[in-house]
Amino acid sequence: MMRIFTIAAILTLVANNAHADDPIVGNWKTELGDTAAIASCGGGYCITLKSGKHAGKQIGTFHGRDGEYAGKITDPDANKTYDGSLAISGNALKMKGCVLKIVCESQTWPRM
């Protein structure tokens, strides 16, 4: 029984460290100058605004690794959710949100 517990604990630590080392995790500056935090959640990553008028609101959920991610992003002002993608390039997070994969908008957020 103790051996199973030890193995489970080691696997949990390895899984948590894999997410901790992912380049997407951290604080990013939005185009409006607010702080957005990206952290591991539910087997993927969540984007939560930490400052500004929508502070505390989760605005995105993404899955992926090695600098390429896909998921959903929410415009907090319009409260509309879009298909999105994220890509890390150095200390920049390039985001794209699309309606029907036809009409897309992009933003680039620098790492803080």
Model-derived features: positions:
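Sec-dependent signal peptide recognition
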Residues: 1-8
